[in-house]
Amino acid sequence: MTEIVKVREQLQMSLSDFQEQASLQSGQIFVVGCSTSEVLGERIGTSGTMEVAEAIFSELKQFQEQTGIELAFQCCEHLNRALVVEREVAIKYQFEIVTVTPVRSAGGALGTYAYHNLKDPVVVEFIKADAGMDIGDTFIGMHLKHVAVPVRTNVKEIGSAHVTMAKTRGKLIGGARAVYAAVEETTTCR
């Protein structure tokens, strides 16, 4: 089995397992950070390839077709971890568009591949995603809504890269009288 086939299979299994637990809904935003270098067993930012990026991108697009989610592809630190999204997503969610063209050496392989393969790509600096996947310890947390909840899947690595996933939930706010599940006894002020 080739490395690319293995990466595709691991990603498919990971996304399937994640969706079983997270139940993402159509229109929710799923952020992906990925070091293709780490997938290949190399240090982040040193050996990324468009071949690995294409494999990951195509599996993520299939996941999008199955679930109706919106994808956001995190670029590398040289672009301050900005994100590639479809223009319609940026407009719908009122993300501020910035001017830059990701390239492998400043954007990373996956961000660059996404920029050249989405229908109408733009780059945005900030989003608050509903869920996400981090392949190779790229740190997607800055792009997740509060509160991030880790989701454990059976897949711990994509290729040689450590993989973590998270969904989000609304904050539980209030004090001693706060209630988090509606029950009949909560209809009075006492």
From Swiss-Prot:
At the top level, the lineage of the source is Bacteria
Q: Which regions span the lipid bilayer?
A: none
Listed Pfam families: DUF436
Q: Which HAMAP family does the record associate with it?
A: UPF0340 (MF_00800)
Family statement drawn from the similarity comment of this UniProt entry? Belongs to the UPF0340 family.
* Protein name per its UniProtKB record: UPF0340 protein BC_5317
